Amino acid sequence: MRINEMALHEKPRERLITYGAKSLSNVELLAILLNTGRKGFSSIDIANELLKQQSTIRDLKKLSINDLLKIKGIGLYKAVILQAAFELGERINSTSTFDKVQITHPSDVASLMMSTMKDLEQEHFVVLLLNSKNIVTKQAWVYKGTLNSSIIHPREVFNIAIRESSNSIIVVHNHPSGDVTPSKEDITTTYRLKECGDILGINLLDHIIIGDNKFTSLVEAGYFDK
């Protein structure tokens, strides 16, 4: 059934206005984002098809623009809207997660980052900015791709820390393979960042590697003692 054929009280947009967003199903919320359907298919039909692409709604964020464009009824404009909505939801979730979290152990970092990073299909490099009490004040995602010591430049990392008047930083990246063994590039990157941090007076407290529900701390592994 087309949405314009529904009774007024059954239409997703009108239901949201009357009863609030929490009263809507995932399909209805996606249908509102999609706005319109295509010939023979309503936005609700397309939303149902979209949900079939992943096992959970949280995993929708894994869909690229090209993945979304493969779904009939989703063009570039709709794909961009969806990606923006997924990213905004992720950022809101991350902001609430990081609110006044104090880092006292590498496992604290893993707890913060595991759900966000363990299923990423590419390597991402994140800088956590901390104040003098080791409370995370901000996270900065600075790189996506294959980690290489020549790509992760200390200037980019520490510019953020200086701009935010951070006392110290912790860097985090993921291994899509799930194996958290540090590579030579991981170790080289760590040494470069630690050396620059010592010069600037902004301590690199740790480098955490996130894998499949496990992690490695390069501090605990002894690399900061060398």
Swiss-Prot record:
It holds the Pfam family UPF0758_N. Belongs to the UPF0758 family. Zn(2+) binds at residues 173, 175, 186. PROSITE patterns: MPN, UPF0758. It comes from the Bacteria. A motif (JAMM motif) lies at residues 173-186. This is UPF0758 protein SE_1336. The keyword Metal-binding applies. GO terms for biological process: proteolysis. CDD domains: MPN_DUF2466. Residues 102-224 form the MPN domain. GO terms for molecular function: metal ion binding; metallopeptidase activity. Keywords: Hydrolase, Metal-binding, Metalloprotease, Protease, Zinc.
